[in-house]
């Protein structure tokens, strides 16, 4: 392999120029998530419809009903939980994690008086009637963020979104008569079926749309205005809460101004980050379109992205309350930021989590009795309030450790030591203090007496938890190693407790067929959460140079493959592709990504939780649940095909099949902050270092 070093970063625009144009066939009427997506990190727009009707579904990434939630209680101590688990007391655990309804609820005339949680709200829809014209197709240029709708008679409607102006624009050609209507969520059946019983009033209409006064949260507005231009009309759409009025002089902006903003924004985005070129058009689209969606929903000036980003349904509550799900889903949503080089996109998430520290510190005190810890439940709203109902998930401390690992990974990639000093290091130490408080001495080693392997056994106390879950062990080791590295980076001496945990806590729980989920629980059926293999990826804590360990890994992998995909959900498929690449099976990695595209995308390229098409998984009953974790994880998986780091060494093109005769990447980020270009042509590999980090570079092979 030839390695060449360049003195300065080179911005290679050829790859940007060839970015994928994604196409749609209309009608797209199954659900809004079949539509063409636009977002600015705050507002999301989905363009869908059929016949003579265009629907613009609008959502906001901060639109929460904050009432409710399940604060940690003194009864929910780790000691009490262990005692109930040992007695197999399912009723006791259910009672411990159920609470009375607080007084700020006050529904009227409904049975909604039981336990409840915060949830994200639908906003509304703008519809356009086309005066007899018919929608035929649509497309989106991922290089510029510009889209268009093509009518059956060949005329085109242009689409663009401006982050700078917080404005979506739709240019209608001269001679096409359109009628607009702005429909609030309260005009849909969800209002009379649910929202009115939860204390919501109907939205109040105004000249351009409506304003919706919420029970305890800030009001929200959706507006749409048609403005005549020389060559047609432009419809402008915006949302607003307490921001300044968006672009009051819309008539002077013109569609051209919005389109220019979009071109500039996406040019800068693509030049900042990684680009790839592969001969497989489906994999190329997964990367280009997925990275576009990642950049849209995680903008550095936007709101932290939850399961659906800002693309929320307009006529129903979003699945799982639209929560921040920290046992893998948020991590997958943000995973393209690292190898992709979009480090600033992580900051809204990190600022939000660090702002929760008083709550998380109180959780730790009640959970394990320490004052210097942090406990982040796996499901929370944007204030860090626990969204309850799943006790085994709530006590999953790997959620906290994984977020701490994300923070330090950002430091490694970006070199941002100030962030480490100002909050990340404290969060990492607090997470480790809780893990150590959970551990006990057992046969001369450290052991975690009770913990979950995520989503295994649901909430069945006889199945869902056990001693030394391999997932928890891997998360703890990742955190320890990150803490030691962080201390050295800051010129501090590593805590002896961390070193003791690294030495005496097992790396995984072993069984006859490889890694077990936890003690006494082998991997016996297909499952969506590959958590027992997390020591391979994402945590990279398994020493593959140890021959005995390598044999355990081989057995684990074979058992996992044998159990198959029958109970997989969409978000776990790209993770599986990375695991295939990790063990050196590139054809399996790529075919797994192609399977995700084939089975877990709807006809409008929407990333689904359940399989849309049959034959790959029996988890296929809910074909309209969109989540962004799968799409973002697919982007990350494509980059891991190009460069994959294992045990401190980076291997280039490890996940690329030999049938790919020409494959390349540009501006890819490594864990020390180095940026690299690479190409493989007929088996010959060339690597260029085009940017340099401040850490120790990984070994290259």
Which role fits each region the language model picked out?
Residues 53, 67, 73-75, 326-362, ...:
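Active-site core of glycosidic bond-cleaving carbohydrate-active enzymes
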Residues 105, 294-303, 319-321, 345, ...:
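Secretory-pathway/luminal and periplasmic proteins that interact with or process carbohydrate-rich
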Residues 152-167, 186, 404-434:
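A conserved hydrophobic secondary-structure block that centers on an alpha-helix together
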Residues 3-14:
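Sec-dependent N-terminal signal peptides
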Residues 309-323, 371-422, 436-499:
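The feature captures the catalytic groove of carbohydrate-active enzymes
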Residues 18-323, 342-347, 353-362, 491, ...:
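Acidic/polar, glycine-enriched structural segments that form the non-catalytic walls/loops
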């Amino acid at each position: 392999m030839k390695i060449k070093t360049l003195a300065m970063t080179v911005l290679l625009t050829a790859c940007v120029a060839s970015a994928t144009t994604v196409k749609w066939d209309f009608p797209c009427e199954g659900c809004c998530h079949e539509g063409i997506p636009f977002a600015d990190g705050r507002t999301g727009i989905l363009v869908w419809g059929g016949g003579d009707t265009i629907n613009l579904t609008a959502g906001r990434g901060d639109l929460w009903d904050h009432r409710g939630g399940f604060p940690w209680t003194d009864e929910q101590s780790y000691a009490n939980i262990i005692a109930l688990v040992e007695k197999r007391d399912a009723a006791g655990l259910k009672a411990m994690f159920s609470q009375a309804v607080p007084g700020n609820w006050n529904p009227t005339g409904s049975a909604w008086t039981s336990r409840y949680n915060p949830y994200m709200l639908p906003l509304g829809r703008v519809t356009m009637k086309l005066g007899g014209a018919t929608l035929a197709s649509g497309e989106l240029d991922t290089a510029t963020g510009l889209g268009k709708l093509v009518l059956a008679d060949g005329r085109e409607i242009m689409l663009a979104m401006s982050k700078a102006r917080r404005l979506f624009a739709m240019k209608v050609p001269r001679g096409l008569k359109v009628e607009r209507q702005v429909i609030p969520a309260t005009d849909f059946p969800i209002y009379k079926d649910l929202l009115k019983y939860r204390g919501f009033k109907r939205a109040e209409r105004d000249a351009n749309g409506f304003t919706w006064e919420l029970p305890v949260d800030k009001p929200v507005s959706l507006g749409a205005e048609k403005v005549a231009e020389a060559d047609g009309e432009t419809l402008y759409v915006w949302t607003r809460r307490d921001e300044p009025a968006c672009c009051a002089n819309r008539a002077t902006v013109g569609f051209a101004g919005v389109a220019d903003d979009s071109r500039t924004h996406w040019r800068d985005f693509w030049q900042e980050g990684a680009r790839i070129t592969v001969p497989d058009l489906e994999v190329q689209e997964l990367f280009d379109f997925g990275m576009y969606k990642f950049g849209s929903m995680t903008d550095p000036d936007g709101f932290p992205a939850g399961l659906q980003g800002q693309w929320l349904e307009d006529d129903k509550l979003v699945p799982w309350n639209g929560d921040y799900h920290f046992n893998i889903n948020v991590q997958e949503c943000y995973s393209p930021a690292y190898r992709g080089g979009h480090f600033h996109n992580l900051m809204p998430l990190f600022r939000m989590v660090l702002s929760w520290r008083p709550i998380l510190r109180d959780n730790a005190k009640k959970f394990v009795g320490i004052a210097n810890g942090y406990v982040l439940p796996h499901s929370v709203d944007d204030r860090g309030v626990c969204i309850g109902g799943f006790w085994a998930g709530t006590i999953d401390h790997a959620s906290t450790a994984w977020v701490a690992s994300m923070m330090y990974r950002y430091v490694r990639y970006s070199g941002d030591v100030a962030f480490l000093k100002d909050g990340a290091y404290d969060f990492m130490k607090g997470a480790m203090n809780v893990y150590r408080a959970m551990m006990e001495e057992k046969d001369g080693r450290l052991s975690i007496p009770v913990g979950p392997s995520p989503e295994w056994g649901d909430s069945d106390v006889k199945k869902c938890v056990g001693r030394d879950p391999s997932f928890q062990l891997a998360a703890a080791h990742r955190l320890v190693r990150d803490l030691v590295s962080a201390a050295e980076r800051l010129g501090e001496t590593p805590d002896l407790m961390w070193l003791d945990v690294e030495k005496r806590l097992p790396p995984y729980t072993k069984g006859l067929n490889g890694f077990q989920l936890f003690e006494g629980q082998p991997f016996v059926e297909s499952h969506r959460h590959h958590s027992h293999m997390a020591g391979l990826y994402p945590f990279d804590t398994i020493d593959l140079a140890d021959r005995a360990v390598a044999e355990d890994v081989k057995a684990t992998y074979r058992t996992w493959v044998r159990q198959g995909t029958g109970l997989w959900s969409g978000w776990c498929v790209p993770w599986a592709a990375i695991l295939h690449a990790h063990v050196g099976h590139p054809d399996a990695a790529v075919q797994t990504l192609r399977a995700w595209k084939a089975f877990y995308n709807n006809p409008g390229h929407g990333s689904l939780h359940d399989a849309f098409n049959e034959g790959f998984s029996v988890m296929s009953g809910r074909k309209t649940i969109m989540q962004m974790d799968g799409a973002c994880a697919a982007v990350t998986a494509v980059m891991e095909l190009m460069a994959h780091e294992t045990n401190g060494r980076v291997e280039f093109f490890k996940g690329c099949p030999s049938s790919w005769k020409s494959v390349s990447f540009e501006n890819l980020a490594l864990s020390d902050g180095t940026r690299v270009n690479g190409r493989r042509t007929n088996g010959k590999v060339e690597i260029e270092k085009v940017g340099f980090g401040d850490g120790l570079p990984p070994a290259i092979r």
